[in-house]
UniProtKB/Swiss-Prot annotation:
Family according to the record: Belongs to the intron maturase 2 family. MatK subfamily.
Coiled coil: none
Functional note: Usually encoded in the trnK tRNA gene intron. Probably assists in splicing its own and other chloroplast group II introns.
InterPro entries named among the record's database cross-references: Domain_X, Maturase_MatK, Maturase_MatK_N
Disulphide linkage map: none
Gene name linked to the record: matK
Primary location recorded for the protein, binned into one broad class: plastid
Keywords per UniProt: Chloroplast, mRNA processing, Plastid, RNA-binding, tRNA processing
Name the record gives this protein: Maturase K
HAMAP family linked: MatK (MF_01390)
GO molecular function: RNA binding
Intracellular or extracellular location(s): Plastid, Chloroplast
Amino acid sequence: MDKLQRDGKEDTSRQRRFLYPLLFQEDFYTIAYDHCSNRSSSFEPMGNSSSNDRFSFLTVKRSISRIRQQNGSIVPFVNCDQNKLVGHNKSFYSELVLGGLTAVSEVPFSIRSKHSLEGMNEWASFRSINSIFPLMEDKIPHSNFILDIRIPHLTHPEILVRTFRRWIQDAPFLHSLRSVLHEHRNLIISSNLDQLILIASKKNTRLSLFLWNYYAYECESLLVPLWKRFSHSRSLPYESFIERTPFYRKIEHIVIFYHKYLKKSLWFLKDPSIHYVKYRERSIIALRGTYLLVKKWRYHLTNFWQCHFHLWLQPYRIYIDELSNNCFSFLGYLLSVKMKTSVVRIKMLDDSFITDLITKEFDPIAPTTLLIGSLVKEKFCDISGHPFSRLAWTGLTDDDILDRFDRIWRNIFHYHSGSSKKDGLYRMKYILRLPCAKTLACKHKSAIRAVRERFGSELFTKSFPKERESIFLSFSKTRSQRERIWYSDIIQRNPFVNS
């Protein structure tokens, strides 16, 4: 890989045109087998692995020689008769070839990403998911509409091959990739991203996730020049003017006056206010303008993807939400913008008067109903909140049972600490106490009342570490109940969050 990177710096076209010979190198299949063995160990027990599936360089050499004997084609090798594969089954060879193809496909893109991220170590500080919300808290209140885009997952193999042509110019490699994609269509066609990840874990290959991530990257990469055009237009900061409507009128008259009488070229006031956020299969575009402008944006985005990617994106996959009337779900929160009225006393030279100042405020709320539904899905309770005991945990010690329930509650509260209303979170804590007590009662074959009398207040006593509890108490004393705390050490989504 280091040699390829050095060659890539000298001649970037070399890494695009000579990928096919890499399919006949033993090292890439060793790397592929490493990935397969590591991923399989996390999903399947070791007892299920067959002794015939052990890796050896002799097997790889025989496989490569068999590929060469079949005129350099990979697909006949993948689809060959199982009786011809002495000592190994067909799935082993198929996974080995798919893994090698994935390793070779990642070569130009890994080099490209490494070059683009050189000298950008500060990106490591933005790994937290919750870093998205402070950005949205600053930008979304100044927007009127939200375009909620669901990236499609039903992708034709030929579209992926055409997308690869933008960066890979090796025709034999593209033909091999096309044949493999047409043969393994189930790796790239799924209803949602979670199902795609499940398929990838069962099939023991990274090809499906690599193809989807690359396709999603290409779909949004061409939108960056559009955002840059709007960013070059002059705009004024929001903090400078409380009431922007009269200011717009004054600027309009000034521009007309200077244009008529002074005949000078002036900068017009432009305020596009376009903000883009993406996580997994969802993209959020916040816009400031009228409903007609937002519909035009949806129309242009749909046509743009159809022309450049042959992607027939249905309009219903781009939702339009008006922030003043509706809320939208994103990363486990119900996000909305509410109007906040403040009483302001204005003092002038001879007089003073009181007026109302209306401002917009970002209002994230933890959806209690969805969180309870997640507990129902994990069989902690029913839809009415009636608790279920975890019979599979009765073989653990009391401390382990308490730690598991405590960890669930701590993760939920830690993730949703930015909610403006904490009542629903404390309700979740109360609901989780009941399955915990019932599990302990089943273990000791006693009543729930006896468990509560025995453990007392020790249930969920570890929900906060001491330093975090002191920080939270200090915030609660100095600030109101609606203050939000965004923890920056969250790098993955809460498993109980479904939206």
